[in-house]
Amino acid sequence: MEIGKKYELNPHRIKSFIDISSSNANMVGIIQENGGWFEVKSILSLDGFDYVTEIICANGEIYNDDGMGDDYFELSEEEFYCFREYKEPTSEEDKVEDKVSDVTKIHCIVDENNVDEIIELLRKTFKA
């Protein structure tokens, strides 16, 4: 990971990430509840390993390793494989979306832990 770059969880690695540490489930929640991606603001190098110690989420919320409980956020270099670089939607996608009426775009990450929650969100969105 690099300072200034944006990342999101790799949907195929969420379970692996949560299995690494009990606090990682909270970090998955932080990412998903704050826009689905984050930008790295600070990295600490210690004993030959890099640690992401501060992020800013898609919605502007900031989390770091000074946070307590549910606000704690820190990624070790060994966890970086659970993430991928976030790609901004292209202007082509935006143009297509503007031409199609009644389109709702939802960005979400689904795994076996939140599938029911996501299904309910989709139902509420499309069955008004």
Swiss-Prot record:
The gene is frd.2. It holds the Pfam family FRD2. It comes from the Viruses. The lineage of its organism: Viruses, Duplodnaviria, Heunggongvirae, Uroviricota, Caudoviricetes. It comes from Enterobacteria phage LZ3. This is Uncharacterized 14.8 kDa protein in frd-Gp32 intergenic region.
